[in-house]
Amino acid sequence: MITGKTLRDAIISGANNIANQRTRVDELNVFPVPDGDTGTNMSMTIGAALSELNAMPDTCTVAEASKSAASAMLRGARGNSGVITSLLFRGFSKALAGKTDAEAADLAKALQMGVEAAYKAVMKPTEGTILTVTRLAAEAAVAAETDDVPQLWATVCEAGQKALEDTPNLLPVLKKAGVVDAGGQGIMLVFEGMKQVFDGGEIVAGAEVAAKPKLDSSAAGKGVFADDLMKVEDIKNGYCTQFLVHKDPGASVTRLRAFLESNGDSVVVIEDDDVANCHVHTADPGMMLSEAIKYGYLTNFKIEN
């Protein structure tokens, strides 16, 4: 069993671990486009919860810690992998709602719910990515049937690492670049940081270091275009566009999501009671924003070519 304090500290530890090694994760980034920002986006997403988590008292419940983290990550989510990361922690919030402490089975269910939410939110789920890594980790957690949290999380990390190392076999662009999936590597750094606290250790300290790549990444990063992994002319929707919709009363973004899917790709939309975080790769960001404003006022714009 873990307390709210332990869960709070574990999430902080995971956030620090990905922040410390974000540059190395950026260098692995070749899918869906080789824009070299996956580690940074994931770090900023989970890092958005740090101020609120650090302010929580040691007496907090697991429900309070998970809800605070999930809410902050939804609003701060950046990039495709960042939005998926926020969905994983939203699963924690839903599974742990109303609970003071959490059993191992609760954490397994939380991870499973997060993965299910992520698959539903992604327009076209692609295997060999963060989705595969977290799905197989969650399946192993559910199958473990252990009451021991450290043992459960060790199973999560072991299954996730195995899945990560297999990603080049599922996604040809990764094998061509000689790397594992950047999003999968990023979430494993988060899980490993959490494991240190679940095992009774201290929170991972914040200090950026070079992470040891799981496969040779010499072809990744600045060399991917020269390697012809993805030519510029092959990218039809060249603008990564992201924004928050602060919804009008009674507004539902279901139709907005359909519009984004019809006019772009890499669409991920996550919705809370009063806000929706929308991510899309498109050739016309202005058209996306013009449609979105019909559902509420917009903030947190990010448009990158």
Residue ranges and their predicted role:
Residues M1-N305:
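N-terminal loops that bind phosphate or other acidic moieties
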